[in-house]
Structures are given as structure tokens and as C-alpha cells.
């Protein structure tokens, strides 16, 4: 199985499964990962590795808490605050919009919470005669950048799980991702301020304006029904996130157990699962929210799609790598040792291609 020809077949099979899964949408990416894993196992005889159970359970716990916060009105409350901020400072919408969507995703751990703010951003920009593409473009990018910086996002949780055993803490990850993404978002916002012509100078916009093609109907975000419950849910969720960051940054805060004569510290995966499940339960109890309602929002199905995607794709990818580790090591070891920065560029380009 170490031959170059068979290795190329593996690569094509893995890429094909990913591409087809991406086209199917929803849980398609994950289930196609299962198909790819089946081919690797039953056709090519590769031994499956252990599925990423810890990563999946961490994501499920975080999504449970975020879903309960949404059911209690927490996300609606955050959107209402964002609307007030943007309408109060319309001339700075290009700078404020990405910061708002970044903060939303950073707190909730998912970019889906930023969708509700986008219509408000577009309306405020149009009313201020600012090209809507300027704040909208960078706002969407900012929400995705925040995924890599959020301590409870699927990406960060997955990375923390993959780096378990390498003496890398959650704080080590955040002290790189948070400054890097914030700086990138701010630079992108400044650049976006010069994208395209001003609306008063844009002939196409002026033409459509004269033809009355623009809808003057004002977008209004509905008031939160139970403001107290909404505020409590957001506060509980933020406190849970803060506890996770503290536990991840200071190992001495974690519980330790004597196992076979050795002191073993509780891993971050278990801590994240315990804290977030507890936060979800506290939100439901304190705000008197129906647990069924938590599964009917937009956050829960999106999060479960991420779990299935990681289940299939990560399992298939790990099996592929372990089955071809000798060949892969020989082919890239020399290059990585001489030019480690080139490996980072190669990974970046390969992800864009996929």
C-alpha cells in the first residue's frame, strides 16, 4: 500500500468523497466521509482508526448550550443590541458591522447567529449612502474569522482535541488566534471602506433609484418577549465560556485523580462537556424554557451537521493518513525540515482548492 500509484488512488478517492459531500450539502459531507471510509476499509484494506468521539461530544455540548440560549431569547436580545448600535452610528457601519458579527460568533461559537444582523447592516448602509457591499462583505468574513478565535467554536474545540498530548493549552491557541483575527478584520474593514464607487457617483445605483427599484420598507427586529430570561441566558453562556477559558489556561484549576499510583488531571474535553451541558441545563431551569424548543431553532441543526461532518470526514481523513504515514513522511519530511513555512502555504492552498 506504500506504492505511489496506490497512494494517488487513495488521494483521489478521499477528495472525491469530500467534493461530492460538499455538493450534497447538510450532513452530506459527513455521510460521504463514511462512504470514503468504507472504500478505504473494504476495498483497499486499511484499518480504520478510532473515530473522533471527544471532539464530537465537545461540539455537541457547546451546541446544546447555544441552542438553549437561542430558545430563551438570548440570540434575539444580542441582535436587538446590535441593531441599536448600528442605527445609532450609521456613518461608521463599515467599521462596526464586522466587529458586531465577530463578537456574535466569538460568544456563540457559530457563525449562524450573525445572519439576523445582515439585513440591518444592508439597510443602515443604504440609508447612509454607503455601498452595502462594503460592510456586508467584511461582516460575513469577520463572522467566519471569529470561528477560529472563539474558545467554544467547533474549529477551536476540534483543534484542542487534535493537539491533546502536545502540552498546548486553550490559552496558547487563543493568544494567537484572537489578535490575528481581530487585526485581520480591522485591516479588512479599512480596505472595504474604499471598495467600489460612492453611491452618489454610481450611475447604475442612480438609475435604479430613479426607476424606484429599491424597497423603502424599514426592517424592524422584533422586541424580545422576555428580556430578563434573554439577558440571563446570555450571561450564563458567557460565564460558562469564561470558566472554560480559565480551566484551559490554568491547569492547576482542573480536578486531579489518583489512578494506578499516578496523579491524572481531568482533560479539557471532559471539562468543556461538563461545563457546557451544565450551562444548558441552568439556562433551561432559570429561564423556564422548554427543552424541545432548543432543538427547533437554527443553531441546533447547524451544529449537529458539524458533528456529522467531523464524524465522517475526520474519521476518513485520519484513516487515510495513518494508512499512508510512511509514504507521506518520506515525501514531505525533507521539504518541511528545510522550509516549514512552505508546508503552511501548501495546506492553505489545498483548503482553498477543496
Label each region the model flagged.
Residues 1-6, 10, 353:
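Single conserved hydrophobic/aromatic residue that forms the stacking wall/gate
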Residues 3, 175-287, 291:
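Long, contiguous bundles of hydrophobic transmembrane helices that form the permeation core
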Residues 8-19, 24-43, 53-64, 232-244, ...:
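Hydrophobic mid-bilayer segments of alpha-helices in multi-pass membrane transport proteins
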Residues 16, 20-22, 32-41, 46-130, ...:
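Membrane-embedded alpha-helical segments and adjacent helix-loop junctions characteristic
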Residues 63, 101-118, 132-197, 351-352:
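Alpha-helical transmembrane segments and, especially, the helix-loop junctions at the ends
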Residues 151-162, 249-257, 316, 320-324:
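Membrane-helix interface motif
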Residues 161-162, 255-264, 329-335:
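Membrane-interfacial helical/loop segments at transmembrane boundaries in membrane proteins
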Amino acid at each position: 500500500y506504500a506504492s505511489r500509484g496506490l497512494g494517488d488512488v487513495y488521494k483521489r478517492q478521499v477528495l472525491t468523497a469530500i467534493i461530492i459531500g460538499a455538493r450534497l450539502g447538510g450532513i452530506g459531507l459527513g455521510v460521504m466521509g463514511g462512504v470514503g471510509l468504507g472504500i478505504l476499509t473494504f476495498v483497499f484494506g486499511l484499518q480504520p482508526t478510532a473515530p473522533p468521539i471527544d471532539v464530537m461530544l465537545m461540539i455537541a455540548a457547546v451546541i446544546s448550550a447555544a441552542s438553549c440560549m437561542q430558545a430563551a431569547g438570548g440570540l434575539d436580545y444580542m441582535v436587538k443590541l446590535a441593531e441599536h448600535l448600528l442605527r445609532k452610528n450609521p456613518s461608521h457601519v463599515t467599521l462596526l458591522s464586522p466587529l458586531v458579527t465577530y463578537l456574535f460568533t466569538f460568544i456563540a461559537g457559530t457563525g449562524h447567529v450573525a445572519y439576523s444582523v445582515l439585513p440591518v447592516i444592508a439597510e443602515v448602509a443604504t440609508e447612509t449612502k454607503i455601498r452595502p457591499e462594503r460592510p456586508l462583505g467584511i461582516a460575513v468574513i469577520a463572522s467566519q474569522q471569529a470561528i477560529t478565535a472563539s474558545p467554544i467554536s467547533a474549529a477551536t474545540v476540534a483543534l484542542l482535541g487534535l493537539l491533546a498530548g502536545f502540552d498546548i493549552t486553550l490559552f496558547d491557541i487563543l493568544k494567537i488566534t484572537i489578535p490575528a483575527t481581530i487585526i485581520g478584520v480591522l485591516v479588512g474593514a479599512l480596505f472595504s471602506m474604499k471598495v467600489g464607487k460612492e453611491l452618489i457617483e454610481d450611475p447604475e445605483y442612480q438609475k435604479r433609484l430613479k426607476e424606484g427599484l429599491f424597497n423603502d420598507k424599514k426592517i424592524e427586529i422584533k422586541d424580545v418577549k422576555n428580556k430578563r430570561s434573554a439577558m440571563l441566558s446570555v450571561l450564563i453562556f458567557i460565564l460558562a465560556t469564561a470558566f472554560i477559558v480559565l480551566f484551559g489556561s490554568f491547569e492547576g484549576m482542573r480536578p486531579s485523580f489518583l489512578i494506578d499510583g499516578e496523579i491524572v488531571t481531568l482533560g479539557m474535553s471532559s471539562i468543556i462537556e461538563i461545563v457546557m451541558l451544565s450551562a444548558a441545563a441552568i439556562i433551561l431551569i432559570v429561564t423556564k424554557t422548554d427543552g424541545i424548543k432548543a432543538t427547533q431553532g437554527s443553531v441546533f441543526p447547524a451544529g449537529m451537521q458539524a458533528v456529522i461532518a467531523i464524524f465522517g470526514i475526520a474519521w476518513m481523513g485520519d484513516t487515510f493518513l495513518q494508512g499512508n504515514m510512511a509514504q507521506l513522511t518520506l515525501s514531505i519530511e525533507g521539504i518541511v525540515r528545510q522550509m516549514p513555512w512552505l508546508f503552511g502555504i501548501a495546506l492553505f492552498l489545498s483548503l482553498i482548492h477543496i
